[in-house]
Amino acid sequence: MATLLQLHFAFNGPFGDAMAEQLKPLAESINQEPGFLWKVWTESEKNHEAGGIYLFTDEKSALAYLEKHTARLKNLGVEEVVAKVFDVNEPLSQINQAKLA
């Protein structure tokens, strides 16, 4: 079953195009993660937060990525990562044009 991972954390920038340029190598590497399907990058310069919404093929892959990414962020000085993991209701999501693959 597809699994959604939602996370956010305190982030002081850069934001926007500068963030995209600086984090492009990270974005490209995420594509290689086992079970990874897609990510929507999120940011709020106003609230000094960043994060993302990820879709994985299964919960095991989502949790493995969460563990890896949380450790990476902590090494960069991020003190707290707020994460939630959800099962995806695929029949209802498809009615609303969700891209699940």
Curated annotation (Swiss-Prot):
Native organism taxonomy: Bacteria, Pseudomonadati, Pseudomonadota, Gammaproteobacteria, Enterobacterales
Recorded GO CC terms: cytosol
Subunit note: Homodimer.
Residue ranges of coiled coil: none
Protein name: Putative monooxygenase YdhR
EC number, as in UniProt: 1.-.-.-
GO molecular function, one term: oxidoreductase activity
Keywords, ordered alphabetically: Oxidoreductase
InterPro entries listed in its UniProt record: Dimeric_a/b-barrel (IPR011008), YdhR (IPR014910)
Role of this protein: May function as monooxygenase and play a role in the metabolism of aromatic compounds.
